[in-house]
């Protein structure tokens, strides 16, 4: 709203846009990363400014300002003159109970016109991408507006040049680490494969050889465990950038939660919206992976692309497209990318869930007889590729050097040192409740559905309950007898165990048995 009045000489003076004050009440409502403001239906500000449900509103507290989406309260949750904020908005403004906020209409968004440009199929410049990414990060674009940008950028609608510009804009939105070493290696797995916890084996092998590998990893959002969740069962992962640097300079490597360091922070927002609309865009995936690697300060990256019917990458043609984009865009941005297409047809190792996956990792690092060989072999292949980034390692010899570092115990010793440097090694916990799922008939395992198995592990409590998840006893190609356990569900509570068992009754085709040949 603008106010105008007559000046002494008869001219009209227009004052700046007015804002209105409301007193804050803490409601304690979590909306993840979405800024929401709650106002009464009869609020005088709503009426005077024409605010309606879902209106985007500028909210200012002192020197801090955000744009929030309006939700209207029809009960007595708020008193007249009060407003509430979602926890995310509350923390963004550093608000306290009783603080007075100012609310007003925000300025028109330049970024929204660029989103429209992309919707109509036109190519975006780096400057336009940067404006969009800055508004994504600051919360000026709503989730609905972000989803429009993501949809307009999916299904091959981003050119290779646009993917490069988007990647660069995402890197420039956060911090960028630099290291003393001229060669810095990073490793990434595209995902969709339960139990594929190779990072915890690759990092100590590479660090023990003497190469620098500062690994930032994510927590689970839709899976039973992220690498950070699994590592957290063994050592602290929430390290400040200063502490992370100290660990890497001391031990050549680390395995920390990426959320504690501001590397390509806009990516976290885009991923959250992508998952909400169940959208996988190859252009966005490439920008997401490469922006994180480059922001970490990597000069070389080894990327594992598991391919399988229930993995994230479902077929060979999609895998080859992803491989080409990662290598070409990485090269244009000064990152040497090496991709490996691997078997994504079934889970890796025995454990699915933080503690159970950590148990498998420790078995491999310690060379125990019951260590899962598939996890060991995948980790050695990836570690070998990482070692071959160094001119000291001839092509083709990386895996044998990695094997020697693992079998000699040097990798385990380095892993212990990294854990101690990050804050101390922890003992693994075990679940209170277990339930074995047995074979209804004798046969050979012909198919394992990664997604359904992961869903059961999540219903059992993973990753929030660190010891919850699934212990997989049979893999594809193995024969089982009638009544033999196929997998065991682990849970911290009987209620969560019942939830997981309920899903079992609905979905009988998680592990399919064929005839013994």
UniProtKB/Swiss-Prot annotation:
Enzyme Commission no: 2.4.2.4
Keyword Transferase in annotation: yes
Superkingdom of the organism of origin: Bacteria
One Pfam assignment: PYNP_C
GO MF, any single term: 1,4-alpha-oligoglucan phosphorylase activity
Keyword Glycosyltransferase in annotation: yes
Enzyme category, top tier: transferase
InterPro entries: Glycosyl_Trfase_fam3, Glycosyl_Trfase_fam3_N_dom, Glycosyl_Trfase_fam3_N_dom_sf, Nuc_phospho_transferase, PYNP-like_C_sf, PYNP_C, Pyrmidine_PPase_CS, Thym_Pase_Put
GO CC term, one of those recorded: cytosol
PROSITE patterns: THYMID_PHOSPHORYLASE
Keywords, alphabetical: Glycosyltransferase, Transferase
GO biological process: pyrimidine nucleobase metabolic process; pyrimidine nucleoside metabolic process
Spans traversing the lipid bilayer: none
Catalytic activity field: thymidine + phosphate = 2-deoxy-alpha-D-ribose 1-phosphate + thymine
Similarity-based family: Belongs to the thymidine/pyrimidine-nucleoside phosphorylase family. Type 2 subfamily.
HAMAP family with a match to the protein in the record: Thymid_phosp_2 (MF_00703)
The protein, known as: Putative thymidine phosphorylase
